[in-house]
Swiss-Prot record:
SUPFAM superfamilies: FMN-binding split barrel. InterPro entries: Split_barrel_FMN-bd (IPR012349), UPF0306 (IPR011194). It comes from Salmonella typhimurium (strain LT2 / SGSC1412 / ATCC 700720). It comes from the Bacteria. This is UPF0306 protein YhbP.
Length: 147
């Protein structure tokens, strides 16, 4: 199994992302339920335009964040650190992403918030189930690497 496939399988089983944005010297983090898109290597989420993080992001912004589980033992720790770009989707892109998102999270039908995409450009996946401190690295526009 290649690195991106391994990372993608794990991301598809999780559902909460933490992401951070920077604007005019200020940092802010937020959490949301997400849907992983393996084809585009992206996360889709809903967040209102009035939130602090959306205001700081504008239509598009650099982003960094994490996805992690909550294991009870160190040997089972798995998690992703990433950097990429967050952007607010519009039109058909938004409609298609919302439809897929609502299949996974039907309760979100009551939320009128816009759909955002976090395009993952760099991923570091720590997976202690493969050995303590095992890291898998992936870069967009580059071959997967292992460290």
């Amino acid at each position: 199994m290649d690195t991106l496939t391994a990372i993608g399988r794990w991301l598809a089983k999780q559902h909460v992302v933490t992401w951070c944005v920077h604007h005019e010297g200020e940092l802010w983090c937020a959490n949301a339920f997400y849907l992983f898109d393996a084809q585009n290597v992206a996360l889709y989420l809903l967040t209102d335009d009035k939130t602090r993080h959306a205001q700081m992001s504008g239509a598009c912004a650099p982003v960094a964040g994490t996805v992690n589980g909550q294991p009870k033992t160190v040997a089972r720790i798995r998690g992703v650190q990433f950097k990429g770009e967050i952007r607010r989707l519009e039109g058909q892109e938004s409609d298609a992403a919302r439809k897929a998102y609502l299949r996974r999270f039907p309760v979100a039908r009551v939320l009128p918030a816009p759909v955002w995409e976090i395009r993952l450009d760099e991923i570091k996946f720590t997976d202690n189930t493969l050995g303590f401190g095992k890291k898998l690295h992936w870069l967009r526009d580059s071959r997967a690497q292992q460290a």
